[in-house]
């Protein structure tokens, strides 16, 4: 189980080295990179209190669910869902009995990494041809290529998948395929297969707020595509700190109190 260890903020030198490495590896062409693209940069965390004038956002505060309605599952998907033993939510079991992959230090994957139950933040950086996301949870890094490339014809399945993006006005549209089937979509065990096709529409609706609409299309697990809506808030002055994964750490739940009293 992952335990959040509060450490000193990442040093400026480390960030500079990482950024330089990324810039050096950026490949041409960059013809679709818009120099005037909307600015998504900053440290973000899922919002705990959507604004009064916002439509209903469907991520549960405690259990880290992606949606508050059960999506239309296929028999295969229903079987996977019923076999899941989450340690949160109405179907929750003790951690020692859970088969949630993250309790064994597996990466949560996308989209679940956005909504991990302790509310850990992520940072967005934009460089020519790419949008980079640094997640505090287990220090995962996600690259979204915006240089006009298409998905590779030979993708090695992974936890984060293969992501390409384009700008539609003020919205970054991210298309991701190439997932493995070793993760859940959320903390309550919503399943997916290696056929998952995820589309995210990321939009900064104000200086302090950003929305992400997730379209889940997985014909093996669900009878039709479905959408979940999530709201994120800017955290000025926050830094991404060190997080390590410790297998079967029963003290994991205590990190919520740390976040409430500290960050």
Regions found by a protein language model. Name each.
Residues 4, 15-16:
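Classical secretory targeting signals
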